[in-house]
Regions:
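Catalytic cores and motor modules of nucleic-acid processing enzymes
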Residues: 1-232
């Protein structure tokens, strides 16, 4: 129990789930949190399944341990979406899953068992609706687009670089408080919409205006030539 809360020592308001999620933006901290939560869940499972261990705690303590498990399981589900981590329930042993089913309804936790595809409008948008704040939704869009850019960048560098630049510009504006959380989210929805449609501000020759494969080839060649001859 104490080890789990120790992960969040720097946080002032430990009841603020948004502050906790922002703190978990660091991948190393997030990984530590996931591992510590799994250990805590297993320990709680042992207590609930042992008459002697159960008897060693007051009822209020058991309820506190249970509520902590529920609270951080919700956080875990949310940040895995927010930061585009691989969603995998394999670390939850059958006993752990049964325990969660006992104390948490389906509505309590975002249930996701398949990888999230941001190109599927209905699926991803439903997931976003479950996130608690405008910033968490915007962060999720940024993380998932960035992940896709990283995986596919070599296929069309110019195309993906254009979206990286738009995302970085929006992040900088948000960081400098030029954009509010709502404005940041609105801008990210615009980026997501263009990303899905393949719309960029990049100009192509008229003959390949409707040919995405030709545009990808053109983008690769153009980026090489622009870099070689230092063309702006």
């Amino acid at each position: 129990y104490s080890h789990l809360w120790d992960v969040f020592t720097p946080i002032k308001n430990k009841k603020d789930s948004e502050e906790i999620e922002v703190f978990l933006a660091d991948v190393d901290v997030r990984e530590k949190f996931y591992n510590t939560l799994c250990s805590y869940g297993r320990a709680f499972t042992m207590v609930m399944n042992s008459v002697q261990a159960f008897a060693a705690f007051e009822r209020q303590e058991i309820e506190m341990f249970r509520d902590t498990l529920i609270f951080f399981t919700k956080i875990r589900k949310s940040v895995k979406i927010r930061y585009a981590d691989t969603l995998d329930n394999s670390e939850y042993e059958p006993q752990m899953r049964n325990l969660l089913d006992t104390y948490m309804s389906v509505k309590d936790v975002i249930q996701i068992y398949e990888p999230i595809d941001i190109m599927k409008i209905g699926d991803f948008d439903k997931v976003l609706e479950k996130l608690p704040s405008d910033r968490s939704k915007a962060d999720a869009i940024v993380s998932h687009i960035t992940k896709r850019i990283t995986l596919n960048h070599d296929e069309n560098p110019a195309f993906y670089d254009s979206f990286s630049q738009r995302i970085n510009a929006a992040l900088e504006e948000f960081k400098n408080k030029v954009l509010s959380e709502r404005e940041f989210l609105k801008k990210m929805f615009g980026v997501l919409k263009d990303f899905r449609k393949g719309n960029t501000k990049q100009k192509f020759p008229e003959k390949i205006a409707g040919d995405l494969d030709a545009q990808a080839f053109y983008g690769v060649i153009a980026s090489i030539l622009f870099a070689k001859y230092k063309i702006e």
